[in-house]
Amino acid sequence: MKLSNALLTLASLALANVSTALPKASPAPSTSSSAASTSFASTSGLQFTIDGETGYFAGTNSYWIGFLTDNADVDLVMGHLKSSGLKILRVWGFNDVTSQPSSGTVWYQLHQDGKSTINTGADGLQRLDYVVSSAEQHDIKLIINFVNYWTDYGGMSAYVSAYGGSGETDFYTSDTMQSAYQTYIKTVVERYSNSSAVFAWELANEPRCPSCDTSVLYNWIEKTSKFIKGLDADRMVCIGDEGFGLNIDSDGSYPYQFSEGLNFTMNLGIDTIDFGTLHLYPDSWGTSDDWGNGWITAHGAACKAAGKPCLLEEYGVTSNHCSVEGSWQKTALSTTGVGADLFWQYGDDLSTGKSPDDGNTIYYGTSDYQCLVTDHVAAIGSA
């Protein structure tokens, strides 16, 4: 999801109300073999297996949870997810900046003057440490990604700004930028390499390469996923793309086209990619709400053909949440090849007030939450 300026402002205001005295940092989750789970999340045919249970799973997204500075807020969210029956939480494992932030501001990596500096301090990756630790305690599984295509929280453009280039697309082919990117990946993966909380490592949030030949992203995906598997062969790896570029059941509309440099079927065929991802935003793509059901089934068919499950990783609308998104959930649950769905995005009442709302947010305890979470989890249980 590309965040609006208004949403970023809301997030900034929420974090600005928090004391700059950060809580005492928790140590990074143990990476010793004794701390490792007996089994990591995996695929099983066209389904996922979590903690020994194979089936369909529901989850959500929270880009902001790793930037919170109050541990109690993190625990509140994790507790609500667990009690709701949600199993997977996708979080942003990046927070890139191009200048030194003010004291008390959370940031993960600084790109400046041709070099990158990773922040492992109390206002850096130690905040993500607590998210991982809390997820372990609450039996929540995390998808952690490493960079954003969009400029929100730095993105690929932060690398381009520091190392030179004409745009985000240079990120994929620059040896210098890829070296810095892989250094960051290595730091994060090794930090949580045996945590029971990690569901999958994700290359990026919504990677695109407009007007590029599809080989550009294919080569980057293949190289990066193999690099990650070399660091952690036991974990699943996914792309984090929107599912663009698909011939199966195509109606010729923009998302099915290859103009963003993506070929869903070809990329899914890479042996170091464990499952496919797709996002769903008809309002942004110039399609109808009903169109979304066909988008889901088309990807299910592609994943079935590949022998790998699909994850409906993001989906949202700004109105009529229950009727529109509820229909998509039913389609996903009944479609062979789709193994889980994560709505965008989760909302809660934090110590500083409500978490950020981009119009898609589904807040805990609301009527929308009842239909899209409580009822959906019940439907999964009875399927």
Swiss-Prot record:
Catalytic activity: Random hydrolysis of (1->4)-beta-D-mannosidic linkages in mannans, galactomannans and glucomannans
Keywords of the record: Carbohydrate metabolism, Glycoprotein, Glycosidase, Hydrolase, Secreted, Signal
Compartments, as annotated in UniProt: Secreted
Glycosylation sites: 17, 194, 263
Location of the active site: 206 (proton donor), 314 (nucleophile)
GO molecular function (one): mannan endo-1,4-beta-mannosidase activity
EC number: 3.2.1.78
Residues reported to bind substrate: 92, 205, 281, 344
Any GO CC annotation of this UniProt entry: extracellular region
GO biological processes: mannan catabolic process
Recorded family membership: Belongs to the glycosyl hydrolase 5 (cellulase A) family.
Function: Endo-1,4-mannanase, a crucial enzyme for depolymerization of seed galactomannans and wood galactoglucomannans.
UniProt-recorded name of the protein: Probable mannan endo-1,4-beta-mannosidase A
Species of origin: Aspergillus niger (strain ATCC MYA-4892 / CBS 513.88 / FGSC A1513)
